[in-house]
Amino acid sequence: MGLSFFLSPALLIFIFKQNSKVDKFSSYQKFPPVETADEDGLLAIGGELSVERLIDAYNRGIFPWYDASQPVLWWSPDPRMVLFPQQLKVSKSMKKLILNNAFEVTFNRDFEAVIENCANIWRQGQSGTWITEEIQKAYLELHELGTAHSVEVWDGNNLVGGLYGIYLEDKKVFCGESMFSTVSNASKYGFIKLVEKLRAEGVKLIDCQIYTAHLESLGAEEISRKEFLGFLA
């Protein structure tokens, strides 16, 4: 992802306070209700990227999105871009690539390489990355706990595409975070393979967070935040 920020004057700024004299768990300050997010979806500012806070955030329909020059920004947009696995759209050209086994796809083989590539890949219209070293470290910890998952797309021994996200397995919801591709169609190929896998596992919904025409072309759609939160209940 990546965006320029405009904070509405009406924004309710919620600062997480930390007290070093209190242990980590008892000092944990909860997120405000998602209904208090501003019109752009910005809900809260501040706090640390601990495993506990991140897991709590995703289970509440909240995700971090900011760049290295900013404090941690927490978002819960309305509407929410999602993909229902059964609504996946696969173009004729992609079907041909899949039929011909154009790439090899693996899962959780090299999470660290995937998130590093997502951070470093050049994206049109972006001068930097939101996947900071802090983000990479936090999500690597989540991966080690089995919560963050990766998809790798290979051309021989070369990693040419991939994506990663958070798997709320108990809720049958996968929250996509970022993808990259160094050759044409590699990330899309990996995404299609992931959706097929998740569909077989009974996943109800893939959270795509915000609208893009690319996601819409794959079958994703916008639903209300209220409807989205129903899948996390």
Residue ranges with predicted function:
Residues F6-A233:
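N-acyltransferase acceptor-side catalytic subdomain
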